[in-house]
A protein has these predicted regions:
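Positively charged n-region of N-terminal signal peptides that target proteins for export
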Residues: 1-4
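C-terminal motif of bacterial Sec signal peptides marking the signal peptidase cleavage site
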Residues: 13-16
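Surface cap/lid and interfacial helix-loop subdomains adjacent to catalytic sites
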Residues: 18-19, 148-160, 182-328, 332-333
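N-terminal extension/subdomain marker
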Residues: 18-98
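Active-site catalytic motif of lipid deacylating hydrolases and related acyltransferases
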Residues: 22-28, 73-162, 295-312, 316, ...
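Structural recognition of the beta-strand scaffold that forms the well-ordered cores
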Residues: 68-72, 117-120, 165-166, 195-198, ...
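Gly/Ala-rich beta-loop-alpha elbow adjacent to hydrolase catalytic centers
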Residues: 168-172, 176
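Short, hydrophobic alpha-helix immediately C-terminal to the catalytic nucleophile
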Residues: 177-181
């Protein structure tokens, strides 16, 4: 017990020892080179480049899958000492995070529903959100320009008229909100949209003209989204979340609470699935979760914001739901 108390004290002490970094002004001249998405090296994942670890969670017959999954990963550049506004695509550290964290514990949930496409992009540093007026907006727009270009190349080179699942988290969802607007909303391509999982961002139900929140487990052609916090906790700017789409990621309907036995599975970093691990409550703009039952539960008791677990906390629930929606789309359109 003394050792645990010491570790908690040490972490708190180290966090309090903050260094001051001078953030350079955003400059379009100094941004990393724009990617060419016709080159495979600029894609983290294509159907023919699955890593050994990803294959463990994927369909054994990828070629038979009738849908595609276009996934945009969350903010991974969070180090304060990194003064770059945007990350170059060939940054090995970021590439490792994309493949072995984001893809492995988020995108993997969708690999039985469709072929996975994950573009690298010049991701904006996390500070961009708190410094929108002094470079953050430009950094995020640059990142979206890459995502947009990647999607255009995907449509041109890979899609071949197949139905699409759009999947994203955090900064990725900042970009896919625009992607839905620019390519799907009130446009012919909406007919190919199975579903959009726009997770870890605030999204209002009236954001689009013709794309609506999905309210049943087998709804198609719309979107779902949620933000997860510890039960009873609120974000600092909780008013931003009020009225936003808050999908129940366990029942996928209008149920406001769930029981342990309804939870299908939380994928932890040990790559094990923990079933019946949590209960949730849907409140205005937030999903409140109990402390999940898994080996590191004690440490989770000190965390209120479950943002990083928005997807893998409900990994198996999402996996089964994505497959249901995909099968529903195929059945209705054939």
């Amino acid at each position: 017990m003394k050792k645990i108390i010491f570790l908690i004290f040490l972490v708190s002490f180290l966090q309090s020892c903050k260094s001051t970094y001078v953030i350079p002004a955003f400059s379009s001249v100094k941004t990393p080179s724009a990617p060419d998405y016709h080159k495979e090296e600029n894609w983290a994942v294509l159907p023919n480049t699955y890593s050994k670890e990803l294959k463990q969670f994927s369909s054994t017959q990828i070629d038979t899958l009738q849908a595609d999954v276009f996934y945009v990963y969350p903010t991974l550049n969070t180090e304060k000492e990194d003064l770059r506004w945007n990350v170059p695509l060939d940054d090995k550290k970021q590439q490792d995070k994309v493949i072995n964290k984001a893809v492995l514990f988020q995108a993997s949930a969708f690999t039985t529903s469709g072929k996975l496409y994950v573009p690298y992009y010049r991701q904006a540093h996390i500070r961009s959100y708190s410094m929108l007026d002094v470079g953050g907006k430009e950094a995020l727009l640059l990142a979206y320009a890459d995502v947009k270009k990647a999607f255009e190349t995907y449509l041109e080179k890979y899609n071949n008229g197949r139905p699409i699942l759009i999947v994203s988290h955090s900064q990725g969802s900042t970009h896919t909100k625009f992607l839905l607007r620019d390519f799907f909303d009130n446009k012919p391509l909406q007919q190919k949209l199975i579903a959009a999982y726009i997770v870890g961002t605030v999204i209002q139900p009236t954001l689009y003209k013709t794309i609506k929140p999905m309210e049943k487990p087998n709804d198609i052609g719309g979107f779902v989204g949620w933000n997860t916090y510890k039960k009873g906790a609120y974000p600092q700017k909780k008013h931003f979340f009020k009225g936003s789409v808050t999908t129940n990621p366990i029942t996928w309907d209008d149920q406001k609470s769930t029981r342990l036995k309804q939870h299908k599975g939380f994928l932890y970093t040990d790559k094990k699935l923990y079933k019946n691990a949590l209960k949730i409550e849907v409140t205005d703009g937030l999903i409140w979760s109990t402390n999940p039952k898994f080996p590191m539960r004690f440490l989770m008791s000190f965390i209120e914001n479950y943002h990083s677990g928005d997807i893998n906390l409900f990994w198996q629930d999402i996996r089964e739901n994505a497959l249901l929606r995909t099968k529903t789309w195929i059945k209705k359109t054939n």
